[in-house]
């Protein structure tokens, strides 16, 4: 394993935003420097997320490097980085792509400047392609479940959960999404009882990641079936689809006593107002885990949330232990060709085609 810091080039190839809905490949983008608690990663693979297209379409930052999920090799580290990380480590992570505050920090680049305390070392047997699928889905699921939804249970002490079996149910709507499979797996590892909605075609997938039971979201009786299965005790729902239909389904599936509902987009207030006294709704933006101000237009803007970053660091430690023990699996991927040209096309693909049960990954 290399012990000396290699000399980084001054410029690199990266995909940057040009205008709303438009990206370009640029060959003279400045390589970021390793500041405090920052690791520079030589990118080996990147993954495409729906947010890549959404942010480009509705909140572009011209000239900023785009992309969130990556995997690669650490080639440089700044001061105060975690002692367990070394130059030469194979790692996975994610960053705030197309960031107005840090325009040279994005995953769609030859070199990525990543917060070192949110990086995961990957096992030797895990490919960079598989590892590239981890970042955004993992931290969205973790933040949603343990920080926002406040489910009982702990990844570090799953056997210490002292609640009745019928109080352990957690519904994951959209269980076959990349965030959904991460959520199901985390819940199972924390000693809880994940149940999921998905299509019939993806039921085997959600069962493989640990769902106790899967429900066909297209069945008109879906919510009633969930109530019957849980005995009317469901008190936690994570909505990974974030549409009006799934909000309504989650509300209808929850028990009479209510509970908490968390989604990944602003929820429909008209639905929330149907059970204002029993269900506490909220929605999250995973970008807050970096502990910095999120400079995005409208209701997606956030002040810095140090508590979210503290939680994310703790989650990283817990998931690192699971990876080291071989207990954490990755979401199914579809490996694509084309390098940076392919990545650019992939963002267009995710805009028009739903990726059911898999994630597009590009070796670069």
UniProtKB/Swiss-Prot annotation:
Record EC number: 1.-.-.-
Top EC category: oxidoreductase
Similarity comment text for this entry: Belongs to the zinc-containing alcohol dehydrogenase family.
GO molecular function terms noted in the UniProt entry: nucleotide binding; oxidoreductase activity, acting on NAD(P)H
Record function comment: Trans-enoyl reductase; part of the tra gene cluster that produces terrestric acid. The clavatol biosynthesis cluster cla and the terrestric acid cluster tra are both involved in the production of peniphenones and penilactones. The non-reducing PKS claF is responsible for the formation of clavatol from successive condensations of 3 malonyl-CoA units, presumably with a simple acetyl-CoA starter unit, and 2 methylation steps. The esterase claE probably collaborates with claF by catalyzing the hydrolysis of ACP-bound acyl intermediates to free the ACP from stalled intermediates.
Record gene name: traG
This protein's UniProt keywords: NADP, Nucleotide-binding, Oxidoreductase
Residue stretches in coiled coil: none
Pfam families: ADH_N, ADH_zinc_N
Name of the molecule in the record: Trans-enoyl reductase traG
Superkingdom in the source lineage: Eukaryota
Record lineage: Eukaryota, Fungi, Dikarya, Ascomycota, Pezizomycotina
Organism this protein belongs to: Penicillium crustosum (Blue mold fungus)
Entry-linked CDD domains: enoyl_reductase_like (cd08249)
PANTHER family: HYPOTHETICAL OXIDOREDUCTASE (EUROFUNG), TRANS-ENOYL REDUCTASE APDC
Chain sites annotated for binding NADP(+): 51-54, 176-179, 199-202, 217, 264-265, 355-356
Residues bound to substrate: 136-143, 286-290
Subunit structure: Monomer.
Pathway(s) this gene product operates in, as recorded in its UniProt entry: Secondary metabolite biosynthesis
